[in-house]
Amino acid sequence: PVKDRVEDLLKRMTLEEKVGQMNQFVGVEHIKANSAVMTEEELKNNTANAFYPGFTEKDIEKWTEEGLIGSFLHVLTIEEANYLQSLAMKSRLQIPIIFGIDAIHGNANAPDNTVYPTNINLACSFDTLMAYKIARQTAKEMRAMNMHWTFNPNVEVARDARWGRVGETYGEDPYLVTLLGVQSVKGYQGDLNGNEDVLACIKHFVGGSEPINGTNGSPTDLSERTLREVFFPPFEAGVKAGAMSLMTAHNELNGIPCHS
């Protein structure tokens, strides 16, 4: 049973291996593609393009073999996923890699996958069944690519039209956002027992959609009433629907960073 396997692994893992399971890197092909077009200064200083200063793809391959990486994102081909998984199987405890991706409106980052309308367009339909069906089909296509985890649905409530991520949301109404978010979670995850199910991730907790200057990641200043009436309900419903993960926000809320 999975529970017994997990408990056994936790007893046998070193502290370094446990920390390693919390490490997530982009795929080696993504690093190669970005580093090929970056200047020397960018290579040394920049992380925005998924390059890790001081490290190369060889380092990441080595850490994977040592069981010090738990998950990858931006792995866009079956071949690369299989390669990285084969490295993980050489590790001491052979803990499999989890592959995650921003499958926001279909698995659109990967080639030859179905691209659906964005979440804001889906919200215009008020069609909860369609939200479920899109998530279900996206999950099937993800698993066909050896992907296990989508960073969706975005259940932030759109509050500022200047904010650049409005298109990822289900709009400005907390009730509608909640309904569509819950159906998306159910569609992605199914019963989590089959080879057509993926992990959902409700995001971003919390308040990032009302930044003080309209810029993504900027500070937010929100009352407790606004948080409880507007921002919390979609997340609470997502958790109750069984969402297997939650992404914290990139902003600070009332002077306190949502994550560090």
Which stretches of residues belong to each language-model region?
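Glycoside hydrolase catalytic-domain context in secreted enzymes
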Residues: P1-S260
